[in-house]
Design a protein with these regions (language model features):
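Residues at secondary-structure transition points
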Residues: 20, 24-27, 31, 58, ...
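N-terminal first-folded block
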Residues: 13-51
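An amphipathic, aromatic/His-enriched active-site/gating alpha helix that lines ligand/cofactor pockets
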Residues: 35-47, 66-100
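Glycine-rich beta-strand-turn "strand-cap" elements at beta-sheet edges
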Residues: 2-13, 51-59, 87-111
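Short, well-ordered beta-strand segments in beta-rich or mixed alpha/beta enzyme
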Residues: 13-20, 50-77
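Intrinsically disordered, low-complexity acidic/polar segments
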Residues: 26-28, 72, 108
Length: 111
């Protein structure tokens, strides 16, 4: 959900990045990502939580998250499903993730 400019009172937190997954672990990575997204989307303060594959290279997975606040993101990091997901990463990923955190104070629809 893209929040409109009027809806952004405090900084919304956006997390965006990518990671390369192991070819032999792709099916397991998809299952883990789906479970993580399902659990995370139920969290208070989560506006969006998505994984997607690169169209040119299906071993590259993108992550996009939107959080109402830094506090909501911190609560997310302390959840049992986050701990379980992080514990699975070594068997799923082929290298370090490139992930950025953005603090957004305004947003407007394009076009």
């Amino acid at each position: 959900m893209l929040r409109t400019e009027a809806m952004v009172a405090d900084a919304m937190i956006v997390i965006a990045g990518s990671v390369r997954i192991k070819a032999e672990a792709r099916a397991a990575a998809v299952r883990a990502a789906l479970a993580m997204a399902e659990a995370t989307r139920r969290e208070a303060g989560c506006c969006a939580y998505r994984f997607s594959s690169d169209l040119a290279d299906p071993m590259v997975v993108y992550i996009h998250e939107e959080w109402e606040s830094a506090e909501a993101l911190e609560r997310h990091f302390a959840t049992p499903h986050m701990a379980e997901f992080r514990g699975r990463l070594p068997e799923l990923v082929a290298g370090p993730a490139a992930i950025m955190r953005y603090e957004v104070t305004s947003a407007a629809a394009m076009g």
